[in-house]
């Protein structure tokens, strides 16, 4: 039996990964992390979506220690979430939570070991992203190797969106006939606003720009998507 664990926040990317995983695996387990994030309403959104989409199980794990250690505008109300800046100098944004994906993928692997899943699926990508070092393909592969050595079992880290831009991620949701669900019922906004979000933060900017690009050129974007990932 094919089983997978999806690292699930209830945002656009992880929900798209969940939708795809449900087509590819016999059992799909979701794991969501409560680290005291500013936009913690995402946890309720994740619960609703996991139930609505039919995940096999959904575990919400308290990892509050990350909030104590990682200083970020997503973990401290005293640090404002920055608006999108097209002229940013390339420095890490204040929304970066150091160690987040290291911790999440490690714990997801332990959960995968428990439920005998062969894969951990995460929605990180290197194309349209905010410059976070723990979203890079190089990092994911290195951590995957280390965890396999540490637990003595091969658990594949799957990154379906790694080389997709945001327009192609929207196209993937549309391919599975879930574009409206992704648009209106997921929470990607750093300020915790569901759907189209605040429209000001970097996450909302990337999401809106990708949607506009997809809607303006659907046929070409879908063709690009199919060529990249081998969809029929």
Swiss-Prot record:
Record bears the keyword Metal-binding: yes
GO biological process: queuosine biosynthetic process
Reaction(s) catalysed by this chain's protein: 7-carboxy-7-deazaguanine + NH4(+) + ATP = 7-cyano-7-deazaguanine + ADP + phosphate + H2O + H(+)
A GO molecular-function descriptor: ATP binding
Co-factor note (free text): Binds 1 zinc ion per subunit.
EC number of this enzyme: 6.3.4.20
Gene3D superfamilies: HUPs
Iron as UniProt keyword: no
SUPFAM superfamilies reported in the protein's UniProt record: Adenine nucleotide alpha hydrolases-like
Protein name, as recorded: 7-cyano-7-deazaguanine synthase
Family classification: Belongs to the QueC family.
Job of this protein: Catalyzes the ATP-dependent conversion of 7-carboxy-7-deazaguanine (CDG) to 7-cyano-7-deazaguanine (preQ(0)).
Organism: Yersinia pestis
Pathway connected to this protein: Purine metabolism; 7-cyano-7-deazaguanine biosynthesis
Cofactor(s) the protein needs: Zn(2+)
Binding residues annotated for Zn(2+), in chain numbering: 189, 198, 201, 204
Residues reported in the UniProt entry to bind ATP: 8-18
Pfam families, per the entry: QueC (PF06508)
């Amino acid at each position: 039996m094919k089983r997978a664990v999806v690292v699930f926040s209830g945002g656009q990317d992880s929900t798209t990964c969940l939708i795809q995983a449900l087509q590819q695996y016999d059992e799909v387990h979701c794991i969501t992390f409560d680290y005291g994030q500013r936009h913690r309403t995402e946890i309720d959104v994740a619960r609703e979506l996991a139930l609505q989409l039919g995940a096999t199980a959904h575990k919400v794990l308290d990892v509050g220690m990350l909030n104590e250690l990682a200083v970020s505008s997503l973990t401290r109300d005293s640090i404002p979430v920055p608006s999108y800046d097209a002229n940013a100098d390339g420095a890490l944004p204040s929304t970066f939570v150091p160690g987040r994906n290291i911790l999440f993928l490690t714990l997801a692997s332990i959960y995968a070991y428990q439920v005998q899943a062969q894969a951990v699926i995460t929605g990180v990508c290197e194309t349209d992203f905010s410059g976070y070092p723990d979203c890079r393909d190089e990092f994911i592969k290195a951590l995957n190797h280390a965890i396999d050595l540490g637990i003595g079992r091969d658990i594949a880290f799957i990154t379906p969106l790694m080389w997709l831009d945001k327009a192609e991620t929207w196209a993937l949701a549309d391919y599975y006939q879930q574009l409206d669900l992704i648009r209106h019922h997921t929470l990607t906004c750093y300020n915790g606003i569901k759907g189209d979000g605040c429209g000001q933060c970097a996450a909302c900017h990337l999401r809106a720009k990708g949607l506009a690009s997809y809607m303006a050129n659907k046929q070409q974007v879908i063709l690009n998507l199919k060529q990249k990932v081998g969809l029929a």
